[in-house]
Amino acid sequence: NGMAVAEFLESHPKVAYVNYCGLESSPYHALAEKYLPNGSCGVVSFGLAGGREAASIFMKNLKLAAIETHVADARTCCLNPASSTHRQMNDEQLKAAGVPAELVRMSCGLESSEDLIADIAQALDKI
């Protein structure tokens, strides 16, 4: 599921970047192929064009993914650090800490990839 979601996100115009070592565009792709011959994990991080506000709108409109502060479960979990674990920081402080305001971390669960992508697509449409 992680690869399917990462590929969808990489092609979406409202997504600024995708961090997933399974993607050929990743600077870590060669290492992933060497050390993870059976594929990577289901954790995908990505940045939304539009910053903190776009990430907040996206998160509020997800229906399938659970909004959690952790990203390890059989179900899909999603987190925007700027609006949860790091919410006390302003954008400058987030940048200094290496946590972009637009960052979303998604741990893809066992749901069907088609259902996950449909949920992500409808949430992105709300931005």
Predicted region positions:
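PLP-dependent enzyme catalytic core of the Aspartate aminotransferase-like
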Residues: 60, 76-127
